[in-house]
């Protein structure tokens, strides 16, 4: 008689994905972020579910319902701050996960990579809609500014914006539909994450050396299940430190003021995890050009498999590519800083230069570095 985990149709799926899965024996801590993203998603769905039980998606009561959650609901403050900071944690893990993929050449698994890019867009859209729900000043004005960008699309732009708003401005209809979409999207993200995993398990995991590892595979459980558990405990301790000691560190103080369509805040800016893209958007004086740069700043990830020129997969033994990679990471930090600054000198020119460097490193420097390293190694 076979073991139930190998014969039962449902348990067999779990077994192939998380128990008997053959895994490279040398994958490092950078491979932990996939499971951490799964944990983040579970945290966000569960805290969001409890927060939605007390939230009302009406312009008159949305702000006070969030206040009510924090003041009157048992542990409501904890649920609300776990959900708000969970989004930041989600993006920290996401950016590490993508950074690992770029560094070690994981983008050569094209199905997995492209599904990952779709997932990134979905998570960004969901986070943006969630930021609108508390109906504070930055929620309202962020929603107005970002949705208004669609009006830059020729011919259909202004109609499209009014269609999304459900009226002549961001109002009750907008808030209600954003709540509906914000609720459903994480479940779609969870389903897409399963597809992401399915595509990955067709090829098997990459590893730090970037070489085939069929000759040296070990079962996922117990080795990597416990390694993931260590990552999860570390993540949760960091997460709870933020939630319990610095709950407002990631947020904007303007969002503690109820939305007022008659009073524009002096600096409208999104949450910190969108600031790099916001800086790229603002670096182009033309509206349509800015919107295109904004979309391309994420979509450029899809170019990585086609721009891979090196005969080695990862950057582990490629110092020139490493230099360009870390310059890209530094550039993203600079863009994040600029995104939070007002549009005035010297920030304008810094943002424009950082945006040019961002695209130049990805589209020119990394492929050139790869080709140069091939030449140096006489490959």
Swiss-Prot record:
Database matches in InterPro entries: Cyt_b/b6_C, Cyt_b/b6_C_sf, Cyt_b/b6_N, Cytb/b6-like_sf, Cytochrome_b, Cytochrome_b_C_euk/bac, Cytochrome_b_N_euk/bac, Di-haem_cyt_TM
Residues given in the record as heme b b562 binding sites: 83, 182
The note on the cofactor says: Binds 2 heme b groups non-covalently.
- Which GO terms of type biological process are on file? mitochondrial electron transport, ubiquinol to cytochrome c
Q: Does the keyword Mitochondrion apply?
A: yes
Q: Which family does it belong to?
A: Belongs to the cytochrome b family.
Tell me the subunit arrangement: The cytochrome bc1 complex contains 11 subunits: 3 respiratory subunits (MT-CYB, CYC1 and UQCRFS1), 2 core proteins (UQCRC1 and UQCRC2) and 6 low-molecular weight proteins (UQCRH/QCR6, UQCRB/QCR7, UQCRQ/QCR8, UQCR10/QCR9, UQCR11/QCR10 and a cleavage product of UQCRFS1). This cytochrome bc1 complex then forms a dimer.
Q: What is this protein called?
A: Cytochrome b
Taxonomy of origin reads: Eukaryota, Metazoa, Chordata, Craniata, Vertebrata
């Amino acid at each position: 008689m076979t073991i139930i985990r190998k014969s039962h149709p449902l348990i067999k799926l779990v077994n192939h994905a998380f128990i008997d899965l053959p895994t490279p024996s040398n994958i490092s801590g950078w491979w932990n972020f996939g499971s951490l993203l799964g944990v983040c998603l579970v945290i966000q769905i569960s805290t969001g579910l409890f927060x939605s039980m007390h939230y009302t998606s009406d312009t008159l009561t949305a702000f006070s319902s969030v206040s009510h959650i924090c003041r009157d609901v048992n542990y409501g403050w904890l649920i609300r701050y776990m959900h708000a900071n969970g989004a930041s944690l989600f993006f920290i893990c996401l950016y590490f996960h993508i950074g690992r993929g770029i560094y070690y050449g994981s983008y050569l698994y094209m199905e997995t990579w492209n599904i990952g890019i779709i997932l990134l867009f979905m998570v960004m859209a969901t986070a943006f809609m969630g930021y609108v729900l508390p109906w504070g000043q930055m929620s309202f004005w962020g929603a107005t500014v970002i949705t208004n960008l669609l009006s830059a699309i020729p011919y259909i732009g202004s109609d499209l914006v009014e269609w999304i708003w459900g009226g002549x401005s961001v109002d009750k209809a907008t808030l209600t539909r954003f709540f509906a979409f914000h609720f459903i999207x994480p479940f779609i993200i969870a389903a897409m994450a399963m597809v992401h995993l399915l595509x990955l398990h067709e090829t098997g995991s990459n590893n730090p050396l970037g070489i085939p590892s069929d000759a040296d595979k070990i079962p996922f459980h117990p080795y990597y299940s416990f390694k993931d558990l260590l990552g999860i405990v570390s993540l949760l301790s960091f997460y709870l430190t933020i939630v319990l000691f610095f709950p407002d560190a990631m947020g904007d103080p303007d969002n503690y003021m109820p939305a007022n369509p008659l009073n524009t805040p002096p600096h409208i800016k999104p949450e910190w995890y969108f600031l790099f893209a916001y800086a790229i958007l603002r670096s182009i004086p033309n509206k349509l050009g800015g919107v295109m740069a904004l979309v391309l700043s994420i979509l450029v990830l899809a170019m990585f498999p086609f721009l891979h020129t090196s005969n080695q997969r990862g950057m582990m033994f490629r110092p020139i590519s490493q230099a360009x990679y870390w310059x890209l990471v530094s550039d993203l930090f600079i863009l994040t800083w600029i995104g939070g600054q007002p549009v005035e000198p010297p920030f304008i020119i810094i943002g424009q230069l950082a945006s040019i460097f961002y695209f130049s490193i990805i589209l020119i420097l990394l492929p050139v570095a790869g080709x140069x390293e091939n030449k140096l190694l006489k490959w």
